[in-house]
């Protein structure tokens, strides 16, 4: 077979050389060279089969085809001898070869046109796939934007609820402060009522009623505060649950989007590879089928069978390579795709469940808002009741304060009248003693009675020289008993010695250069100022200074302190905790007043000018007819309340 093939090749080459020389000599164009046809066929085969092994097999196939084209098979060369070819047969063969070459070139052009069409179609498919992918991406972005808007809406709602909560807490604190102020004022009222218990026993029922109302207000406030705390706790729990659901939903959506994008990318990649391989195999098969269909005769049957077998081998080899290279990957991708589909289904179910939960939470949030609105409405009603109760209490406090001021003024008037009456009584008793003594002396002188009858009295009584007695009240010094007796009786008493009881009181001297004066000083307890004019006086930065044996003490008024017309301000010592402190007529000093027996109290204005002074001395006793009324240093110089130990 090899020798026959070699002889056929030699005969073919000699025939080709003779035909070429004849065509050149006759002026006929020579057909294209065999290498050119082979290179074109090899280019087509390379486009159809990209691998090196396929290229090698295609070269072998084309070589066999070129042998078939130029000289036919070995059987044809054996059937025809070199001497049997005539010139006409060679021309006919060359014409057939030219026709075949033209057909092959036309087919090649058709294949290139089809290739361009397939490329355009591939570009269109890619654009459609990209548009679909962009559409899906846009949908997921829209869904994500809606989710973000929902999260923003929930966040804004949360911020509004927090602001409402802060506002409610602020209002609650304000009401607490108002409640504390009201309670403080009620305590002050209670202290004032206790201080004036002796003079205002009929006000006990009013005070008991106020205490009961205060207890009711406290109970209602505690109940409302507890309900508000419960509702706030429920609202916080609902907010936390909504936040957790939103976070889990966002995570699930992100995971779903990532898995779908990855699966689509890998599927597209594998589909493109499969399409390229299918296109290559289809192109080669198509070329071989068309080439085979156009050949006829026994000359090409063997070459067609060889080419078909070569193509089958190439296809099997390509299929094996594809199975070997992409089989495992396709299986893995299918498994991964199934798992991702399951994951996506699970995420969709979780997303649906989270949406249902969010709807439930929104419903619950609406219910909680309704409850909060009801609680706020109830709280508003309670606040209105509390404000009304506060107004009523304020009106009652004002009425009781007015009544207390009236009672205090009446008490001051009665006390002043009592002091005046007591002073006049002392003077009258002193004068009566003097008149009795003069009468007894006159009876002895006239002999109506003997001196022995008055001896015991004369020797038993204390003989003292008649002196003046000072009894100075906070409202000014009064004339002495001696001057009054001198006014009533001008009879000189020089020879007779009058036995009388001397009344000694604390010598309290009050001086003032303006309408505001120091009314009373109780050592260690209180300093009272009085405005005797009808106008309101400013006491801003005025100063009260005390000087005694134990040291000094001072108090300065606030810049907005005033004293009304015909009114009194009491400045209590800091040790007097039970005393009222309303900031208007009763003030607690920042320091303790001195408790010395001898005190000098000075009232000065903001520039340091002395406006009033008050001196206290505690040498105070009252002894009339062996009935002594001794004032302890505690009651000495206390003025209005000194006689009652208040």
Curated annotation (Swiss-Prot):
Residues 476-487 have a biased composition (Low complexity). Residues 48-67, 75-87, 281-301, 488-505 have a biased composition (Polar residues). Residues 127-137 are annotated as: Linker 1. A motif (Nuclear localization signal) lies at residues 457-471. The keyword Zinc does not apply. Residues 282-299 are annotated as: Linker 2. Residues 504-618 form the LTD domain. Residues 138-281 are annotated as: Coil 1B. Residues 90-446 form the IF rod domain. Its main location: nucleus. Residues 1-85 are annotated as: Head. It is found in: Nucleus. The keyword Nucleus applies. Keywords: Coiled coil, Intermediate filament, Nucleus. Residues 86-126 are annotated as: Coil 1A. Residues 1-94, 281-304, 476-513 are annotated as: Disordered. Intermediate filament (IF) protein, component of the nuclear lamina, a fibrous layer on the nucleoplasmic side of the inner nuclear membrane, which is thought to provide a framework for the nuclear envelope. PANTHER family: LAMIN DM0-RELATED. Contains an alpha-helical IF rod domain organization with three coiled coil-forming segments (coil 1A, coil 1B, and coil 2). Belongs to the intermediate filament family. This is Lamin-1. The lineage of its organism: Eukaryota, Metazoa, Ecdysozoa, Tardigrada, Eutardigrada.
């Amino acid at each position: 077979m090899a020798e026959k093939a070699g002889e056929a090749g030699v005969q073919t080459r000699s025939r080709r050389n003779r035909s070429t020389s004849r065509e050149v000599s006759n002026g006929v164009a020579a057909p294209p060279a065999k290498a050119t046809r082979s290179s074109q066929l090899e280019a087509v085969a390379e486009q159809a089969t990209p691998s090196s092994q396929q290229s090698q097999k295609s070269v072998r196939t084309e070589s066999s085809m070129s042998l078939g084209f130029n000289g036919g098979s070995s059987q044809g060369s054996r059937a025809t001898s070199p001497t049997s070819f005539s010139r006409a047969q060679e021309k006919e063969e060359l014409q057939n070869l030219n026709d075949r070459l033209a057909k092959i070139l036309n087919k090649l052009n058709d294949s290139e046109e089809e290739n361009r069409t397939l490329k355009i179609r591939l570009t269109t498919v890619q654009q459609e796939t990209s548009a679909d992918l962009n559409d899906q991406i846009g949908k997921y972005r829209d869904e994500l934007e809606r989710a973000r808007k929902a999260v923003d809406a929930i966040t804004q709602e949360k911020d509004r609820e927090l602001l409402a909560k802060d506002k409610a807490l602020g209002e609650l604190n304000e009401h607490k402060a108002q409640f504390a102020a009201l309670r403080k004022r009620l305590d002050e009222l209670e202290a004032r009522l206790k201080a004036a218990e002796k003079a205002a026993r009929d006000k006990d029922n009013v005070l008991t009623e106020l205490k009961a109302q205060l207890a009711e207000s406290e109970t209602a406030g505690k109940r409302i505060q507890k309900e508000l705390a419960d509702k706030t706790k429920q609202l916080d729990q609902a907010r936390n649950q909504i936040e957790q659901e939103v976070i889990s939903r966002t995570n699930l959506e992100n995971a779903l989007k990532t898995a779908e994008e990855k699966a689509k990318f890998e599927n597209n990649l594998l589909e493109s590879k499969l399409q390229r391989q299918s296109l290559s195999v289809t192109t080669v098969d198509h070329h071989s089928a068309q080439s085979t269909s156009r050949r006829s005769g026994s000359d090409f049957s063997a070459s067609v069978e060889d080419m078909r077998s070569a193509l089958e081998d190439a296809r099997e080899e390509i299929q094996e390579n594809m199975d070997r290279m992409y089989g495992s990957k396709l299986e893995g991708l299918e498994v991964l795709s199934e798992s991702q589909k399951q994951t996506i289904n699970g995420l969709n179910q979780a997303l649906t469940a989270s949406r249902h939960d969010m709807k439930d939470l929104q419903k619950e949030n609406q219910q909680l808002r309704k409850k909060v609105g009801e609680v706020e409405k109830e709280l508003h009603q309670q606040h209105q009741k509390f404000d009304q109760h506060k107004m009523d209490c304020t009106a009652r406090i004002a009425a009781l304060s007015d009544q207390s001021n009236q009672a205090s003024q009446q008490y001051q008037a009665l006390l002043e009248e009592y002091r005046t009456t007591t002073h006049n009584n002392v003077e009258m008793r002193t004068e009566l003693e003097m008149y009795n003594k003069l009468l007894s002396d006159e009876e002895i002188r006239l002999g109506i009675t003997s001196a022995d009858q008055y001896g015991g009295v004369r020797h038993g009584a204390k003989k003292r020289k008649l002196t003046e007695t000072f009894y100075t009240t906070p409202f000014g010094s009064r004339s002495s008993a001696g001057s009054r007796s001198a006014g009533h009786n001008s009879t000189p008493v020089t020879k007779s010695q009058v036995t009388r009881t001397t009344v000694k009181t604390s010598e309290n001297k009050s001086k003032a250069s303006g309408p505001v004066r120091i009314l009373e000083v109780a050592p260690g307890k209180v300093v009272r100022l009085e405005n005797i004019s009808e106008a309101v006086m400013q006491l801003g930065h005025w100063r009260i200074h005390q000087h005694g044996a134990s040291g000094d003490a001072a108090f300065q008024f606030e810049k907005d302190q005033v004293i009304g017309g015909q009114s009194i301000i009491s400045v209590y010592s800091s040790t007097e905790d039970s005393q009222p402190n309303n900031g208007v007529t009763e003030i607690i000093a920042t320091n303790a007043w001195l408790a010395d027996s001898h005190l000098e109290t000075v009232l000065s204005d903001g520039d340091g000018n002395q406006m009033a002074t008050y001196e206290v001395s505690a040498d105070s006793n009252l002894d009339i007819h062996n009935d002594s009324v001794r004032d302890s240093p505690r009651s000495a110089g206390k003025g209005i309340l000194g006689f009652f130990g208040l």
